[in-house]
């Protein structure tokens, strides 16, 4: 970590989390998730904050998530010099991505991107893929460019990116990931990896060239390790099948699921790419590409040795149960009376196939997202996402505590909120499902209105929220994630459509208001503007005035009010 950055991060950590300095460590900080003084980090390079309550909290937060402002304006912090014209690119890769630059020499360059429509520019880190084909990442406050974070030039379909120093002809195994930074991250841990650039790019041309290197020897194993979002998982299954049809030995690997989605570069920065964890990620990949529910259940049992458990397959809920007596009889029969000569592990696997029962207990898959509470009304709900097979869009809705208390009540509520969703399991099976899901969920605070919440010091609307001068958008789970605060509005009656693009504001409307209503219109406008701060004004001055708009019929009272 660069000394200036280290000094600023340390200063903020001591002030914001009440850490105590103990040798090479910062300890006894207040965990933002559980509020206990169990947070710690390595003082010499405080990249990751971790909670010491492994079983009850186990929070893990990268410093980029805590202080994003320190990882945005790379050109300002590291301007180019005659000695190092690509200082910003170097700093971005070193500090933002956690890479050892000695492994990346001569494979990237610092360039510039200019958006004429927005009249904005930024430095970029550019990686060549082939002659006339390159990809670059915007590094200076990329949020200014909307959804654009990177640029492509040239046709990359069928190709992949690889480190210039990577000798594919010497590899027994090659990982195929989405992003260039993911491939570089795996390279730091001795894993040969190439980048497809996007999950839907099947590298047919690159694989053909690779096959030519292995004409007289065994081809390497392909490990498809795309992102763990919906698109990444769908294409992992698709490309594994296609590559096998093309004559390749193929399997998969998956990053672990977490509320904050992590890619391979994120895991590299969190020191979570050691050999034992890599085995676990390959296990996740095997589960993803399992051909049927039985195969997936057997994989899970062989790893966990649990005799009974629920699992998901194709967005349906299944239940696995092992009949021990039947298993022992099947094992003895296979091991000692079978026609095939099998070792003990092979006999166990075959006995499992004969003695395990897999039953579908719901034709959809319910996932508890979070617990939402209204402290004023003392009401609470569990917010669920219900996934369906066959690409049917998921639905999200609430369950009360009583609706989760028995299988029959759960079935009624599921039928009510999810068309065609049926739960056929028992109350005991539901209890075990909830015991697995509920302890891990977070709590989301709620308001029953839209507007300013005095309690949470935030403006909460339908799709946007503002707190401490920062704008937040509703996330995929229908709440506003504001760091230590998670918040949503329960209001369903008032719907406001707000535009957060300030450059699209039409500044002519005040003139039209003046032409139509004159000074009285501006008095009403000033009052309306003041209502945005009514709670703050009441807090300081004890009250906020009323405004009465009166006039002759047809004088425009309703028009003025509706406009405002």
Predicted regions and their residues:
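Short, aromatic/basic amphipathic alpha-helical patches
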Residues: 210, 234-246
């Amino acid at each position: 970590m660069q000394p200036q950055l280290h000094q600023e991060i340390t200063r903020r950590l001591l002030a914001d989390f009440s850490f105590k300095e103990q040798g090479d460590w910062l300890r006894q900080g207040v965990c933002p998730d559980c509020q206990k003084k169990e947070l710690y980090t390595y003082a010499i390079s405080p990249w990751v904050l971790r909670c010491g309550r492994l079983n009850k909290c186990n929070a893990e937060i990268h410093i980029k998530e805590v202080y994003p402002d320190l990882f945005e304006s790379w050109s300002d912090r590291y301007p180019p010099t005659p000695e190092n014209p690509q200082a910003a690119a170097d700093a971005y890769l070193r500090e933002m991505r956690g890479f050892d630059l000695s492994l990346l020499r001569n494979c990237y360059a610092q360039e510039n991107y200019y958006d004429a429509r927005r009249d904005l520019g930024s430095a970029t880190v550019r990686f060549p893929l082939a002659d006339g084909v390159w990809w670059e990442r915007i590094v200076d406050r990329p949020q200014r460019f909307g959804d654009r974070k990177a640029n492509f030039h040239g046709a990359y379909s069928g190709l992949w990116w690889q480190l210039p120093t990577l000798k594919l002809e010497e590899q027994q195994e090659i990982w195929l990931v989405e992003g260039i930074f993911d491939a570089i991250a795996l390279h730091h841990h001795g894993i040969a990896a190439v980048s497809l650039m996007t999950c839907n790019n099947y590298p047919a041309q690159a694989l053909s060239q690779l096959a030519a290197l292995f004409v007289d020897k065994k081809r390497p194993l392909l490990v498809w390790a795309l992102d763990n979002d919906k698109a990444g998982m769908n294409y992992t299954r698709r490309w594994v099948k296609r590559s096998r049809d093309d004559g390749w030995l193929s399997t998969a690997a998956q990053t672990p699921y977490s509320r904050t989605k992590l890619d391979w570069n994120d895991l590299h920065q969190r020191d979570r790419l050691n050999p034992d964890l890599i085995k676990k990620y390959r296990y996740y990949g095997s589960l993803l590409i399992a051909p049927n529910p039985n195969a997936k259940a057997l994989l899970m049992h062989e790893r966990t040795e649990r005799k009974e458990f629920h699992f998901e397959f194709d967005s349906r809920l299944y239940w696995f149960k092992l009949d021990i007596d039947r298993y022992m009889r099947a094992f003895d029969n296979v091991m000692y009376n079978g026609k095939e000569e099998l070792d003990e592990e092979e006999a166990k696997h075959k006995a499992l196939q004969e003695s395990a029962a897999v039953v579908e207990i719901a034709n959809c898959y319910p996932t508890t997202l979070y617990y939402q509470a209204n402290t004023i009304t003392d009401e609470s709900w569990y917010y669920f996402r219900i996934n369906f097979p066959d690409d049917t869009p998921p639905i999200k809705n609430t369950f009360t505590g009583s609706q989760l208390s028995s299988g029959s009540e759960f079935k009624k509520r599921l039928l009510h909120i999810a068309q065609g969703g049926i739960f056929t399991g028992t109350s005991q099976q539901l209890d075990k499902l909830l015991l697995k899901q509920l302890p891990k969920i977070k709590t989301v605070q709620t308001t029953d209105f839209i507007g300013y919440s005095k309690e949470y010091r935030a403006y909460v609307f339908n799709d946007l929220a503002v707190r401490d001068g920062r704008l937040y958008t509703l996330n995929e789970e229908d709440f506003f994630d504001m760091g230590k605060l998670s918040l949503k509005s329960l209001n369903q009656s008032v719907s406001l459509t707000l535009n957060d693009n300030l450059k699209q504001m039409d500044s002519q409307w005040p003139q039209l208001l003046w032409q139509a209503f004159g000074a009285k219109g501006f008095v009403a406008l000033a009052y309306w503007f003041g209502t945005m701060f009514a709670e703050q004004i009441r807090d300081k001055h004890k009250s906020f005035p009323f405004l009465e708009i009166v006039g002759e019929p047809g004088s425009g009272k309703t028009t003025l009010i509706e406009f405002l």
